[in-house]
Amino acid sequence: LYTEIYMKKENRAMLEMLMCAALWSIAGIFIKLIPWNSFVISALRSLFAGLTVLAYIRIKGYRIILNRQTIVPGLLLGLVYIAFVAANKLTTAANAIVLQFTDPIFIVIFSALFFGQRFKKRDFIAVICTFIGIGMFFLDQLSEGYLLGNFVAIFAGACLGGMFIAMGKAETQERFSAMLVGQAVAFIFGLPFIITTKPEISALPVLYIIILGVLQLGIPYILYGRAAEHCPPLACSLLGAVEPLLNPVWVLIFDGEKPGLFALIGGVIVIVSVTVWCIAGSKDSEGADAREAS
């Protein structure tokens, strides 16, 4: 009976993770469709996402915790929100999401640089392959805007990796509190741009920003927070890869934006490298757990 209940929870968690990744993937197309400054978009998107997460926190009866383990990752998450939207405005949606998807590689690099963790052979191979993939993105569009967009997307990936390290083994209430801090950071940062750029207020952009805040950012983070409790790490990694695969597809279908050939090749290298590395790490963890149990 316990096994059946656990499997049901695990299956539900995997479904929630898949829904989460699918909803995350609609970011690129809606960011492209809103004719506003990127900082305005990230601010208002975070406002609606924050209200969504706050409502969930209240329903669940969670406390909002402000300490080092929520403020530091929250600040980094806020930078991710800001940089990701800016990257989507500066470069292609495919470049923006795939280059941000490099965050696990930055976790390895930061852990080695700042915490003295030693590289395993597979870590070294994954880092090299990922950076080869990243390099491919810079062979396609050499205009100043695209180059800047690529660097901003890589910065978002680095901040996301740093966020996961700073978050550590935070409890559920701390994870949701960090999300709120991140959304507050992005909103406060964008306030001056809302005032100075005076974005055109019309029905479609307002509808799109609400969709971005509630459906693309707020609800997926709630789903992710729920799924993380029961979804196996390997399944999370594989299902999470749905986002960078679907994101450019929606933009191609609804906006006609096509990534370049080298970007496509680089994207495949990055996604495969990160996913295979995550699978190998998950199998090692499962093997270690089995040895401890025996």
Task: Annotate each predicted stretch with a short phrase.
Residues Y56-K60, D103-I125, L245-I265:
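C-terminal transmembrane-helix exit sites in multi-pass transporters
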Residues K60-N95, L99-Q100, I132-M136, G213-C231:
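Specific transmembrane alpha-helical segments of multi-pass solute transporters/efflux pumps
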Residues V40, L47, V85-G116, A156, ...:
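Specific alpha-helical transmembrane segments that line the substrate/conduction pathway
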Residues A96-T102, M167-V185, L217-I253:
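Helix-helix packing/entry segments at the starts of transmembrane helices
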Residues L33-L79, F106-I107, C159-M163, L180-T197, ...:
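Transmembrane alpha-helices of multi-pass small-molecule transport proteins
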